[in-house]
């Protein structure tokens, strides 16, 4: 199980632990991941995802899982979240934006 948010792609960061005497040692800053069950109104079922607490706030702010996934870019989403996004688009009837060749 990876330590990466399925909706926002937040992952571990690397930094220093700094002691009182200013000695720096390497450490990892892990994202605050929680297992959350979201309700998809379009799919009419519960969806369990491992997301960061920041993503939970973002989903609530955007008006639910369906609205969040429809607005989210495909780059940040996990493969499982991408499948959900496509299923919601198919159910709702929203077409994905077409990229123009330049």
From Swiss-Prot:
Keyword check for Ribonucleoprotein: yes
Annotated InterPro entries: Ribosomal_bL28 (IPR026569), Ribosomal_bL28/bL31-like_sf (IPR034704), Ribosomal_bL28_bact-type (IPR001383), Ribosomal_bL28_sf (IPR037147)
GO terms of molecular function: structural constituent of ribosome
GO terms (BP aspect): translation
GO cellular component: cytosolic large ribosomal subunit
One Pfam entry name: Ribosomal_L28
Key words, A-Z: Ribonucleoprotein, Ribosomal protein
Superkingdom to which the source organism belongs: Bacteria
HAMAP family xrefs: Ribosomal_bL28
The family this protein is said to belong to: Belongs to the bacterial ribosomal protein bL28 family.
Protein name: Large ribosomal subunit protein bL28
Gene this chain is encoded by: rpmB
């Amino acid at each position: 199980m990876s330590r990466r948010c399925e909706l926002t792609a937040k992952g571990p960061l690397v930094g220093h632990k700094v002691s009182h005497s200013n000695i720096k040692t390497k450490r990892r800053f892990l994202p605050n991941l929680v297992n959350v069950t979201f309700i998809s109104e379009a799919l009419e079922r519960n969806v369990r995802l491992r997301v960061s607490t920041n993503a939970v706030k973002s989903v609530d702010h955007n008006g639910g899982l369906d609205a969040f996934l429809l607005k989210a870019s495909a780059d940040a989403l996990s493969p499982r979240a991408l499948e959900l996004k496509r299923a919601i688009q198919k159910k709702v009837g929203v077409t994905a934006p077409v990229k123009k060749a330049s």
